[in-house]
């Protein structure tokens, strides 16, 4: 990547395993990866203030997310609101703030970290799946709205990663998910991060959904 000019990159949810791996995969770039304690993506005032202090943003990686698992009838509205606010509203707020800078620059790239759950649904994750599905429509709308300003927006599905985010998944379920992969193994945060770092510099692609694991869908 040394042949490319350095980028100013913002990664939300900076305390997570994937965010740290992405930051490590971008050596030579200026990376801002604030954890939730420094940037609560649900807070409009906090988000706008954070981005207003930055001289430029070449790449926004909207990675902040959480899940509250359980059958729909057992989910409280507080659970549902928190999942939607973090995964979807947070992406809206950060994208809106970043685009204001990117339009002035006449260049920028937004990568929304989605999930396979947003394409196929997942038992016990209705709120999470709904939020991640929303990212696809949101991201493709942004791509259409701001393509004329040379601002790109793509959605990345990193696949199932064994991180602290998924540490609660029972071993039996892990085995079932692993069997869905034609390679018989999960992505690592480092594998996903290398792909995301590569995508970050693509200047000719927008409005696409990139799947990074080895699960196959019909008509892909």
Where are the model-predicted features located?
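Substrate-binding pocket helix/loop in short-chain dehydrogenase/reductase
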Residues: 71-72, 79-84, 166, 177
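C-terminal substrate-recognition "lid" of short-chain dehydrogenase/reductases
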Residues: 92, 185-212
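Active-site helix of classical SDR
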Residues: 95, 131, 139
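Alpha-helical segment proximal to the catalytic Tyr-Lys
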Residues: 100, 144-148
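Residue(s) in the substrate-gating loop at a strand-loop-helix junction
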Residues: 115
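Short C-terminal tail/terminal secondary-structure segment
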Residues: 120, 206-220
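Short, small/polar-rich loop/turn modules that mediate ligand/substrate recognition or access, typified
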Residues: 147, 152, 205-207
């Amino acid at each position: 990547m040394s042949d490319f000019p350095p980028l100013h990159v913002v990664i939300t949810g900076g305390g997570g395993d994937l965010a740290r791996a992405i930051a490590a995969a971008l050596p030579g770039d200026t990376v801002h990866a604030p954890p939730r304690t420094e940037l609560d993506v649900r807070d409009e005032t906090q988000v706008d203030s954070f981005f207003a202090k930055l001289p430029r943003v070449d790449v926004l990686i909207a990675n902040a997310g959480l899940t509250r698992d359980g059958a729909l009838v057992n989910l409280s509205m507080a659970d549902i609101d928190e999942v939607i606010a973090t995964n979807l509203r947070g992406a809206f707020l950060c994208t809106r703030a970043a685009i204001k800078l990117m339009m002035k620059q006449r260049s920028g790239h937004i990568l929304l970290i989605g999930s396979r759950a947003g394409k196929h649904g997942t038992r016990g994750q209705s709120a999470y799946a709904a939020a991640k599905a929303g990212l696809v429509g949101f991201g493709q709308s942004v791509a259409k709205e701001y393509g004329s300003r040379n601002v790109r927006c793509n959605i990345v599905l990193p696949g199932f990663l064994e991180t602290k985010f998924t540490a609660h998944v029972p071993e039996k379920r892990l085995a079932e998910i692993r069997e869905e992969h034609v390679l018989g193994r999960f992505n690592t945060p480092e594998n996903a991060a290398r792909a995301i770092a590569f995508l970050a510099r693509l200047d000719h692609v927008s409005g696409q959904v990139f799947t990074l694991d080895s699960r196959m869908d019909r008509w892909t």
